Amino acid sequence: MRCLLLTLGLALLCGVQAVEVTPIMTELDTQKVAGTWHTVAMAVSDVSLLDAKSSPLKAYVEGLKPTPEGDLEILLQKRENDKCAQEVLLAKKTDIPAVFKINALDENQLFLLDTDYDSHLLLCMENSASPEHSLVCQSLARTLEVDDQIREKFEDALKTLSVPMRILPAQLEEQCRV
């Protein structure tokens, strides 16, 4: 009986851990993701994270630039005090090619779900340190013209995450070019 309970408990524990696994890219060429990108859609685990117009997470990716150390500089644009502002976020490389550590925007990890390097890139920022465990994802495109295939890839990728996500289209009028 003890053995059965131990086996059942172990099986449940393994099942819980399997739910937390996020499907990320196994390889990433940071040189190929360099350049201009446009945020075409956002998704959040908690819509209140993006409620306020000046929410710190309402930042739009404008470009990516790899550093010689293998880190990734992320050029963001956002509104502060009704004006356009730029911010550069440094994402530090980890042992996993598509996962980076960040210390900004109340988040602590950035990971890439998918990219073809030429037309789309799907990334998420996660705060696993807080009790709420928040997640914000963005669908990026090289051009402002987005086809249905990119939207579908984003929706499909979000379904694989461990928390339910709500998709919000990126509002072009909220974005600014600085």
Swiss-Prot record:
Cystine pairings recorded for this chain: C84-C176, C124-C137
GO molecular function: retinol binding
Listed PROSITE patterns: LIPOCALIN
Domain of life, per lineage: Eukaryota
GO cellular component: extracellular region
Localization, UniProt: Secreted
Native source organism of the sequence: Sus scrofa (Pig)
Family according to the record: Belongs to the calycin superfamily. Lipocalin family.
InterPro entries reported for this sequence: Blactoglobulin (IPR002447), Calycin (IPR012674), Lipocalin (IPR002345), Lipocalin_CS (IPR022272), Lipocln_cytosolic_FA-bd_dom (IPR000566)
Signal peptide range: 1-18
Presence of keyword Transport: yes
Keywords (A to Z) from UniProt: Disulfide bond, Milk protein, Retinol-binding, Secreted, Signal, Transport
Subunit structure comment from the entry: Under physiological conditions beta-lactoglobulin exists as an equilibrium mixture of monomeric and dimeric forms.
Annotated function: Lactoglobulin is the primary component of whey, it binds retinol and is probably involved in the transport of that molecule.
Protein name (record): Beta-lactoglobulin-1A/1C
Matching PANTHER family: GLYCODELIN, LIPOCALIN
Protein's UniProt keywords contain Secreted: yes
